[in-house]
């Protein structure tokens, strides 16, 4: 999902693709609260804008544009493939302005996509911070909080029943202007 996973898992092994002459690049992105917590309304502009996991993927695509040809790849023929949460992530990614002209084809496998409204993302973020004892605007406490605490409260957030069965999702925003 958007909570855990890695580009180094067995399903992300590109050996078989490489044997067929395909340049295969696997990546990681921030997940869970670190990738999708929306904090700007609670802490001000520039702090936790949400969608950091998506922005990570855009940076990977920019890297591919600059470097694919060095590995025999074609930067004008980039296909994204994702399984489960990775499939959902690439669906969100291609709905962003930042991915324009960086992606040419997508293969989302077994990953339906969901995004949340800014208001819902703000409610979830506010609850998460309250649950771990951080007051809005207390940036020092937030910075000292180990990120491993956020997965521990994931079930509490889902129990709120605010909408999606997943607490940390991409957010519809200026960078992702419509629901994929």
Where would I find each of the regions flagged by the language model?
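Serine-hydrolase-like catalytic core of hydrolytic proteins
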Residues: 1-136
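Substrate-access "cap/lid" subdomains that shape
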Residues: 66, 100, 109-180
């Amino acid at each position: 999902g958007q909570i855990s996973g890695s580009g180094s898992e067995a399903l992300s092994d590109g050996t078989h693709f490489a044997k067929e002459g395909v340049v295969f690049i696997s990546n990681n992105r921030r997940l869970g609260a670190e990738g999708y917590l929306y904090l700007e309304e609670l802490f001000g502009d520039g702090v936790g804008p949400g969608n950091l996991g998506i922005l990570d993927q855009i940076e990977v695509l920019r890297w591919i544009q600059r470097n694919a040809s060095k590995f025999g790849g074609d930067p004008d023929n980039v296909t994204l493939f994702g399984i489960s949460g990775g499939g959902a992530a690439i669906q969100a990614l291609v709905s962003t302005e930042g991915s324009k002209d960086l992606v040419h084809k997508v293969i989302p496998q077994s990953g339906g996509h969901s995004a949340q409204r800014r208001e819902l993302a703000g409610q979830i973020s506010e609850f998460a911070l309250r649950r771990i004892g951080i007051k809005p605007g207390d940036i020092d406490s937030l910075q000292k909080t180990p990120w491993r605490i956020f997965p521990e409260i994931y079930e509490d957030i889902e129990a709120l029943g605010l909408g999606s069965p997943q607490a940390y999702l991409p957010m519809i925003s200026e960078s992702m202007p419509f629901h994929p």
